[in-house]
Curated annotation (Swiss-Prot):
Homotetramer; dimer of dimers. The record marks T46, Y109 as: Part of a proton relay during catalysis. This is 4-hydroxy-tetrahydrodipicolinate synthase. Catalyzes the condensation of (S)-aspartate-beta-semialdehyde [(S)-ASA] and pyruvate to 4-hydroxy-tetrahydrodipicolinate (HTPA). It comes from Symbiobacterium thermophilum (strain DSM 24528 / JCM 14929 / IAM 14863 / T). Pyruvate binds at T47, I205. It is found in: Cytoplasm.
């Protein structure tokens, strides 16, 4: 099974001024992110505004990004949903686009119990021949997949190869203490990157790497080299950026940050709205203070 890389970016979806998906810009953004140090890209995840993309748009995005960078880095398709049968169908369709793996979010809104989570993920993963990464984000889904459920899936389903985890460090430690060999954990929260690494996480599926990819690469490389003081210094320097990008709902400020740093990707789609002038100015100050502007 592939490792996918330590620094992955949850890619935004570029839009034209009238709100259509800008596929050409998506290919350009993919190349831009790879040049900035990303070892893999997650397409049509939360940051990619997946709830407001049609299946047809998502499939074309997968094809676009695979064509642009699939020969260089891993491309992971966000195909999870709260409908098991639909997630199976869509995951099979996505597999035919040439992606290297799937990201499967915990079912949201219907709030399944732990046994429901187990059966859902097992059914989806066993329906495809691609490696699957689970995605636990309780703040978005209102359900927390417990470590025991994650570990059960890791042991029982060979192509479930890792998890993007957004719970606290204690939950991460519980997962890592019982994980089978080769099972990877990526932080799903930029602000938790260094704490997660110290407990044993493999890397991060990042949002901030849209604008501070090289710096995050420096942080990870310093940690892996045993230079924890340098890694901590990078973490402290980048923490205001991590926090600033999430001052309002993601990906509103990530798209604003890309515009401010000279790589515009268009607006967000309703029901999200673009950053206000005040929000953008506050973000500009954060980016300038961090040396990004």
């Amino acid at each position: 099974m592939p490792t996918f890389g330590r620094l992955l970016t949850a890619m935004v979806t570029p839009m034209t001024p009238d709100g259509a998906v800008d596929y050409q810009r998506a290919g350009e953004l993919a190349k831009h992110l790879v040049a900035a140090g990303s070892e893999g890209l997650v397409v049509s995840g939360t940051t990619g505004e997946s709830p407001t993309l049609s299946h047809e748009e998502k499939l074309r995005l997968f094809e676009t990004v695979v064509d642009a960078v699939g020969g260089q880095v891993s491309v992971i398709a966000g195909t999870g949903s709260n409908n098991t049968a639909e997630s199976i169908r869509f995951s099979r369709e996505a597999a035919r686009t040439g992606v290297h793996g799937l990201l499967l979010v915990t079912p949201y809104y219907n709030k399944p119990p732990q046994e429901g989570l187990y059966r859902h993920f097992r059914a989806v993963a066993e329906a495809v021949d691609l490696p699957c990464i689970l995605y636990n984000v309780p703040s978005r889904t209102s359900v927390n997949m417990l470590p025991a459920t994650t570990l059960r899936l890791a042991r029982d389903v060979p192509n479930i190869v890792g998890i993007k985890e957004c719970a606290d460090v204690g939950q991460l430690a519980d997962i890592l203490s019982g994980a089978p060999e080769g099972f990877r954990v990526w932080s799903g929260d930029d602000a938790n990157l260094l704490p997660y690494l110290t407990v044993g996480a493999y890397g991060i599926i990042s949002v901030a790497s849209h604008v501070v990819g090289p710096q995050m690469r420096e942080l990870i490389d310093a940690f892996l080299a045993g230079d924890t003081a340098r890694a901590a210094a990078w973490h402290r320097r980048l923490l205001p950026v991590f926090r600033g990008l999430f001052a309002v709902t993601n990906p509103i400020l990530v798209k604003a940050a890309l515009r401010l740093t000279g790589f515009p990707v268009g607006p967000v789609r309703l029901p999200l709205v673009d950053a206000t002038e005040e929000q953008e100015e506050a973000l500009r100050e954060v980016l300038a203070e961090a040396g990004v502007l």
